[in-house]
């Protein structure tokens, strides 16, 4: 491997302040309450990391093929106003997240949106923010839309349609709220296009190879063989397009691993154990507030896992942790994926201009509807 390639791999780790903060927090908690090193590995959800890495590689492969550019040009040549385009992208992200899970939806819509930056003068950063919010709103509707819903559904005793019926009032209300916010946040002015937006060639063999590898990867996940699926994807790109392996955000994998370890250390801190044990005796309102608030600290999936140890699965708990996906970026892993993929430093602050008011609205709406 050349020195340029090595530098390209190392650079994101050096610049990743969020990863540095997670590592410092982990070291501090480990020093306060040491754990066996073997336990640290147990905190990491290996399947999630493998799935994330596989999707990152496959999405980057499609991007390198040029197909996102091709589709992006088709879209902006059909939808001529910023508002119509924003509504289309936001609704598409929400719809995909309902049935493909929120992270898979993001790996489809975010790279496509990023290509629009090359084709027009669109506010791509704002579009990505709204797509991150959209997958939080859309994924809460179904049992398979996000990891917390999968957990809640498995513990609820409800049928697939029964769970959808439980979540529908909140999901529809949040989606309508987000579409209304999208309408007011994007003007109806015409899209200013760059020259030569009528067509764009793409590498068909690489695209078809990515589609084939995607099918293999999904089958391996379905048969509970995620590592074999990842190895197949990795081997495929070694043979077809090695540059893909150098272009993905490798530090994101370490961010998620560090988050899993930090959450594991946090939930085992001795001073917090009496507080956790008291959860079972809390009132419904207190459990709801805790679900929303805890999601802002450890993210909504770990918050769900923790709370299900003490309270039963219910509509109220489901509304709480899904509302908690809004607010701070850490509230949902989908937020972190979207903002990292955007690659804009200022987007992290701008995200909270929209997400924090939506957290307040979602928390109030969820409480009233539950």
Language-model-derived ranges and their functions:
Residues 9-16, 37-48, 158-170, 198-203, ...:
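Interfacial loop-to-helix junctions that mark the boundaries of transmembrane helices
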Residues 43, 65, 69-74, 212-312:
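Transmembrane helical segments that form the transport core of multi-pass membrane transport proteins
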Residues 8-9, 73, 184-211, 243-246:
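Flexible interhelical linker loops that connect adjacent transmembrane helices
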Residues 60-66, 96-108, 138-146, 266-268, ...:
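Short helix-coil transition sites and intra-membrane helix breaks within transmembrane domains
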Residues 89-91, 95-140, 305-318, 346-348:
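Hydrophobic transmembrane alpha-helices that form the pore/transport pathway of multi-pass ion
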Residues 45-48, 77-89, 119-127, 204-208, ...:
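Membrane-interfacial loop-to-helix junctions in multi-pass transporters
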Residues 4-33, 45-57, 206-216, 223-238, ...:
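Hydrophobic mid-bilayer segments of alpha-helices in multi-pass membrane transport proteins
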Residues 164-175, 289-370:
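C-terminal transmembrane helix pair
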């Amino acid at each position: 491997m050349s020195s340029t390639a090595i530098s390209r791999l190392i650079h994101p780790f050096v610049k990743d302040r969020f990863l540095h903060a997670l590592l410092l927090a982990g070291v501090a908690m480990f020093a306060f309450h040491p754990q066996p090193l073997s336990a640290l590995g147990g905190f990491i959800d290996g399947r999630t990391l493998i799935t994330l890495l596989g999707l990152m590689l496959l999405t980057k492969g499609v991007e390198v093929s040029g197909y996102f550019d091709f589709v992006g040009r088709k879209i902006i040549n059909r939808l001529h106003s910023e508002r119509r385009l924003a509504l289309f992208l936001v609704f598409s992200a929400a719809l995909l997240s309902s049935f493909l899970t929120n992270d898979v939806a993001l790996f489809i819509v975010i790279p496509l949106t990023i290509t629009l930056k090359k084709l027009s003068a669109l506010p791509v950063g704002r579009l990505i923010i709204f797509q991150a919010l959209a997958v939080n709103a859309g994924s809460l509707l179904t049992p398979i839309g996000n990891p917390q819903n999968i957990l809640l559904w498995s513990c609820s005793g409800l049928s697939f349609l029964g769970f959808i019926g439980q979540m529908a009032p909140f999901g529809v209300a949040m989606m309508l709220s987000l579409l209304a916010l999208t309408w007011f946040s994007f003007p109806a002015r015409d899209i200013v296009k760059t020259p030569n937006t009528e067509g764009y060639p793409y590498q068909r063999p690489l695209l078809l190879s990515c589609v084939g590898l995607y099918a293999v990867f999904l089958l391996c996940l379905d048969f509970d063989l995620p590592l074999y699926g990842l190895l197949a994807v990795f081997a495929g790109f070694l043979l077809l397009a090695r540059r893909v392996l150098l272009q993905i955000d490798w530090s994101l994998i370490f961010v998620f691993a560090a988050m899993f370890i930090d959450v594991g250390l946090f939930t085992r801190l001795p001073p917090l154990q009496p507080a956790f044990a008291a959860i079972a005796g809390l009132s419904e309102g207190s459990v709801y507030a805790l679900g929303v608030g805890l999601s802002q600290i450890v993210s909504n999936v770990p918050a769900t896992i923790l709370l299900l140890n003490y309270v039963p699965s219910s509509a109220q708990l489901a509304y709480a942790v899904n509302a908690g996906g809004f607010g701070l970026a850490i509230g949902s892993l989908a937020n972190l994926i979207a903002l990292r993929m955007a690659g804009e430093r200022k987007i992290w602050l701008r995200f909270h201009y929209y997400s924090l008011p939506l957290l307040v609205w979602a928390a109030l709406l969820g409480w009233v509807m539950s």
